[in-house]
Amino acid sequence: MATGSWPTIVDVATRTDPEGNIAEVAEMLSQCNDYEGDAPYIEANEKTGHEFSFRTSIPAGSWRSYNMGVGYSKSTTGKSRVGIGMLEDWSQVDRALLRHSGQGEKFRRSEDFAFLEGMSQTIAQTLIYGNTAITPAEFMGLAPFYNSLTAAQNGANIIDCGGTGSSNTSIWYIGWSPESFFLVYPRGTTAGIHMEDRGDTVPAFDNLGNPYLAFTSVFEQHVGLCPKDWRYGARMANLDVTNAGLAGPNAYDLFAGMAETVLHFPKTTKAVSGVEKTDAPNDQFGTRRIWYCNRTV
């Protein structure tokens, strides 16, 4: 996997917390889902979202002969905005249970890690399927941006794998960089998941509404996805997992489809004899290109 020069969640957390507390949490989070080590985190220009500009056309130039002028031309740009979602959860452990466990904070941290992993999986799922039209509080994921083969310009980056049944899935190919696809966090804050230890000052409640003393950890992450340049995202859609990669007249050639998908990106990083070198020294000028698929594929 390419390393690039832009900060990931662990890098940002390390720089913003001299004590290392957030960094430790971020390191744990990066072990839960690979995307945490793939995506650059950029500070948004708003508290609740990020407005960005993108190019809609470029000058083509003019062929000219002697004594012939050249017409004026210019590029054109557009603006768009993505929202930032707020994900939060509370871990509460009965104070008496913690004392009687014989492991104290070690027992509590093992419970906290389960919450970290759960939140990480929620963000990973939202990264693909998030749709504010269905759940307004979350952020918009990849699927709504690449949901039609013909309705939008970015439909050109959707490869139809031909599946028509109920066992279809998608494979995603994303080029991460600060100029293509990146994650954003609110202006004036720090990236990644934040953990607040509230001690035993916050009461917990049983099913009958009765309070009891509990040690409480509050976890929250504010994050959004910015598809600044849609050309660096591609989707292999309608992939029937029952015959992908199998031989036979009806089988889909998975590797041929992946090769076709790679060709949709406008440019790549340093290459030798047409083969990409993901560890190339100048990789910071390109994108960190990653495949995402489920375990079945």
Predicted segments — roles?
Residues P40-A44:
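Short secondary-structure boundary/capping segments within folded domains
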Residues I58-G61:
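Primarily extracytoplasmic ectodomains and periplasmic/lumenal surface modules that are beta-strand-rich
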